[in-house]
Regions:
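Generic structural hydrophobic/aromatic packing signal, biased to beta-strands
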Residues: 1, 22, 35, 61-63
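Active-site/ligand-binding-proximal alpha/beta "capping" segment
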Residues: 29-52
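Flexible, low-complexity linker and terminal segments
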Residues: 46-138
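Flexible glycine/proline-rich, aromatic-decorated loop/lid segments
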Residues: 1-29, 81-82
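Generic structural signal for short, flexible, solvent-exposed coil/loop and linker residues
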Residues: 8-11, 22-24, 32, 52, ...
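Acidic, glycine-rich active-site loops and adjacent beta-strand->loop/helix elements
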Residues: 1-7, 40-41, 67-70
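Hydrophobic alpha-helical scaffolding
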Residues: 5-12, 33-40, 94, 106, ...
Length: 138
């Protein structure tokens, strides 16, 4: 929940001051996905959307609400959950696909969309990879 902040003397004033900070919080080589719900119902549905986008794009998704949503009473329509909903896990290789590959390179962009395929832990030994913060393999 965004607000001016406790150190300014205005901790309960509604503001959207973190949007720009979140949008440009990097070295400038990446874009960030920001979701800004307008009411509690949006918070519910955007939370699901945020998880799907994070899995599909393999990047953090920021959901930013303001103090108005966090502190006020709201009347919203009854929230509905689709029992047939299937989470979007993005580009995930299964055991058969990994078996067919000669080598699996975690960060190789094979189809040019900027999003590499990934494997889930324990699916296949070829899907294992070591990663660290200082670089990638091809």
């Amino acid at each position: 929940v965004q607000r001016v902040g406790p150190s300014t003397g205005m901790p309960t004033r509604t503001q959207q001051c973190d949007i720009k900070s979140c949008a440009y919080a990097s070295h400038g080589d990446t874009m960030h996905v920001l979701l800004c719900p307008a009411d509690p119902a949006d918070c519910f549905y955007m939370a699901v959307q945020a998880f799907d986008l994070a899995e599909r794009l393999q990047t953090p998704i920021m959901v930013l609400s303001d103090l108005d949503i966090g502190m006020n009473d709201w009347m919203v329509p009854e929230l509905e959950w689709d029992e047939n909903y299937i989470p979007d896990r993005g580009k995930v290789l299964n055991a058969e696909e990994l078996e067919e590959m000669e080598n699996f390179y975690r960060y190789l962009d094979v189809d040019g969309d900027g999003i590499p395929y990934r494997s889930l832990p324990g699916v296949h030994p070829k899907g294992a990879y070591f990663t660290r913060g200082s670089g990638h393999t091809t």
